[in-house]
Amino acid sequence: MIETYNQPVPRSAATGPPVSMKIFMYLLTVFLITQMIGSALFAVYLHRRLDKIEDERNLHEDFVFMKTIQRCNTGERSLSLLNCEEIKSQFEGFVKDIMLNKEEKKKENSFEMQKGDQNPQIAAHVISEASSKTTSVLQWAEKGYYTMSNNLVTLENGKQLTVKRQGLYYIYAQVTFCSNREASSQAPFIASLCLKPPNRFERILLRAANTHSSAKPCGQQSIHLGGIFELQPGASVFVNVTDPSQVSHGTGFTSFGLLKL
């Protein structure tokens, strides 16, 4: 008996999607992306177009309103008296609002200008004068890097700064001196910032002292004075020292000034 053997048919290997399906999916993806981009562009265009239409509509309404006012003034019979009176009252209200806004702006500007006039900047900075070696009250000059903001502060007789407006002032002074005295005279060098109120006696506001130096030929030392004080119109301030012959008058050594706060 002859037995026959049939080999099993091998299963076909799994294949991917057909090429037509890949092309379809690719086209569908491109279509969706294009549609999204187109929708976004259309939305932007529509938004801008609506804004433009809104502006044109507002402009048209303004034109119609002005045209109606013109027709009311010419007395055309196509408009009733009631409509004309109402339109005129609206127009007058608009004009009044505009004029009020202009007046308020003018008042604000005027107030700012008056405020600037009422509170001008007052400042002074003067430099020491070498001729003050013979008097205890230091003398000053408007030279070098000096400041004299306006006529509300003046340098009187080269010795004192006089203010013409009441207020708080920051007053300062720097005195540089050369102390090379003999050992027999060891009194400290004293600088005083003094005030002379109008019709009153002068008084000392600030005072500072520094000991002498034995350095040869000269040991430079500086004294700084500064403070905030209330000054009346016509008040004067000046600087007094115990030994003016020791004061250094070089550039930037000795100065004096004030500033209205």
UniProtKB/Swiss-Prot annotation:
Glycans are attached at N240. The record marks E112, M113 as: Cleavage. Disulfide bonds join C178-C218. Residues 44-261 are extracellular. The chain crosses the membrane at residues 23-43. It is a single-pass type II membrane protein. GO terms for cellular component: cell surface; extracellular space; plasma membrane. The keyword Cell membrane applies. Keywords: Cell membrane, Cytokine, Disulfide bond, Glycoprotein, Membrane, Secreted, Signal-anchor, Transmembrane, Transmembrane helix. Residues 1-22 are cytoplasmic. InterPro entries: CD40L, TNF_CS, TNF_dom, Tumour_necrosis_fac-like_dom. SUPFAM superfamilies: TNF-like (SSF49842). GO terms for biological process: B cell proliferation; immune response; inflammatory response; platelet activation; positive regulation of interleukin-10 production; positive regulation of interleukin-4 production; positive regulation of NF-kappaB transcription factor activity; positive regulation of T cell proliferation. The keyword Secreted applies. The soluble form derives from the membrane form by proteolytic processing. GO terms for molecular function: CD40 receptor binding; cytokine activity; protein serine/threonine kinase activator activity; tumor necrosis factor receptor binding. Belongs to the tumor necrosis factor family. Homotrimer. Interacts with CD28. CD40 ligand, soluble form: Exists as either a monomer or a homotrimer. Forms a ternary complex between CD40 and integrins for CD40-CD40LG signaling. Cytokine that acts as a ligand to CD40/TNFRSF5. Costimulates T-cell proliferation and cytokine production. Its cross-linking on T-cells generates a costimulatory signal which enhances the production of IL4 and IL10 in conjunction with the TCR/CD3 ligation and CD28 costimulation. Induces the activation of NF-kappa-B. Induces the activation of kinases MAPK8 and PAK2 in T-cells. Mediates B-cell proliferation in the absence of co-stimulus as well as IgE production in the presence of IL4. Involved in immunoglobulin class switching. This is CD40 ligand. It comes from Callithrix jacchus (White-tufted-ear marmoset).
